Regions:
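Cleavable N-terminal export/targeting peptides
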Residues: 1-48
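Gram-negative and organellar
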Residues: 31-436
Length: 436
């Protein structure tokens, strides 16, 4: 497990400054994908992708952390200065300078067999020209794994206080960011049977939203409060070393705890089935591809059942030791923020190119698409994304990152859909990170 711990630290190494830019620039349902908020190394949450140019080991530029017994402690702080050209995502843009502060603490065991990891982070953004848009997010998680013979038990718990910005897909045109709280508990048990492994898992997540205002009028958000229970089974069969056939079966139950008076409940049950291959055997081509189908049944007769093809895919191409090209695709059915709309089909595609210009100068360019197709005739939202970044690894403790992100979002003209609408937005960010 020591090797796993060290690789987790390496995977976290470069991307933090870029991730902070994404907090400002990226919209959509990412806010509810919990793994996006925790680094690799937190059992149950952090998911390390295949090694890319940005995530590969660079011992001379990695901050080693501080050893406390059998634990490695990594405190970090980042300071950023940004400019957002369209804070409100409107046709008449208003910009603002932003000062960001991001302290974090990652703690990992360095045991040979089992593992424990914890993470705490805070994101504070001060909008100098639009102070009412300032917000502070924080998140904390702890998880662990326990080896039981050849099997493995994984347990994790997390608490997050976040804000939904009005520029996100499916977001309401609120006067200020909508605060919401997420609590999550998850457990899984991997049964190893020679070349076959079976992992049953159980996740329970609660969402609680604070009230906001729209054009100065009170807009309670408690109708979005919900409890989500997910049970899943994942089977992996080893076709060859580092090449696996994967089958995933999931059942989901969403229960809204504060339904609107006079409105049908948005409670639902969902069923997902995916099949695919995870192949990490080739140094040049690595891919994880799952495709399948999802059915969503709603408790209220006013909402028709909905079904759609779904996918979870990632392809990494390494044409040379200095460049990697990563393509990702996700498609799923999500719960909606809009009143009277039970959900939407969400599609996200992204292409990212990472290049090592020098050993300590790393470049990245990406383009992407996000699309939300709302149920009950609620219209559509589409966002086109483009971004570039450069990271200078100064030494083992300091690095400087510059990022630029552009968003072009096109919303439906359907009057029942309360979203921001059409807008373009540019964000430039300069971040200095210091870590021990």
């Amino acid at each position: 497990m020591a090797a796993r711990s060290r690789s987790a630290k390496r995977a976290r190494g470069v991307g933090t400054g870029v991730a902070i830019a994404c907090v400002l620039a990226c919209g959509g349902v990412q806010a509810e994908l919990l793994s996006a908020y925790f680094p690799p190394g937190v059992p149950g949450y952090g998911e390390a992708p295949g090694v890319t140019v940005l995530s590969r080991a660079r011992p001379e530029y990695e901050n080693p952390g501080t050893r406390l017994g059998s634990f490695i402690v990594q405190p970090r702080i980042e300071e950023g200065l940004a400019y957002d050209s369209n804070v409100f995502g409107s046709a008449n843009p208003r910009g603002s300078w932003i000062v960001g502060t991001h302290p974090s603490l990652l703690v990992n065991s360095d045991w040979s067999r089992n593992s424990v990891g914890g993470y705490f982070s805070l994101d504070d953004w001060r909008y100098l020209d639009q102070p009412q848009q300032s917000r502070t997010n924080w998140s904390a998680a702890v998880g662990g794994t326990l080896a039981v013979g050849r099997d493995q038990l994984s347990l994790a718990v997390a608490h997050l206080l976040l804000h939904q910005d009005r520029t996100e897909l499916d977001a309401l045109p609120s006067d200020t960011p909508v605060a919401y709280q997420v609590d999550d508990v998850r457990a899984s048990y991997t049964i190893a049977l020679d070349r076959l492994s079976i992992t049953p898992s159980l996740n329970f997540t609660t969402y609680h939203y604070s009230s906001t205002t729209i054009l100065g009028a009170a807009a309670p958000q408690s109708y979005r409060d919900r409890n989500v229970l997910q049970a899943a089974t994942t089977a992996r069969y080893e076709l060859a070393p580092q090449r696996n056939l994967v089958v995933v079966i999931r059942a989901l139950d969403s229960h809204y705890t504060e339904p609107q008076l006079g409105q049908p409940t948005r409670d639902s049950t969902g069923y997902q089935a995916l099949v695919g291959i995870a192949d990490d055997a080739d140094a040049m081509w690595r891919y994880h591809v799952l495709v399948g189908w999802e059915l969503r049944d709603f408790a209220a007769s006013q909402y028709q059942s909905h079904q759609a093809p779904i996918a979870e895919a990632a392809l990494i191409w390494s044409p040379s030791g200095l460049t990697t090209v990563t393509t990702t695709l996700t498609r799923s059915i999500e719960d909606a923020a809009q009143e009277g709309i039970a959900g939407y089909t969400y599609t996200r595609a992204r292409l990212t190119v990472d290049h090592e210009y020098l050993r300590n100068v790393l470049l990245q360019a990406s383009t992407g698409l996000q699309h939300a197709d709302f149920l009950q005739g609620g219209g559509q939202d589409t966002a086109f994304l483009f971004g570039v970044s450069a990271t200078w690894l100064i030494n083992r403790h300091m690095r400087l990152a510059a990022t630029y992100d552009f968003t072009d979002q096109r919303g439906s003209s359907n009057p029942t859909l309360q979203t921001t609408g059409n807008y373009t937005r540019s964000i430039g960010l300069l971040t200095l990170r210091f870590g021990l």
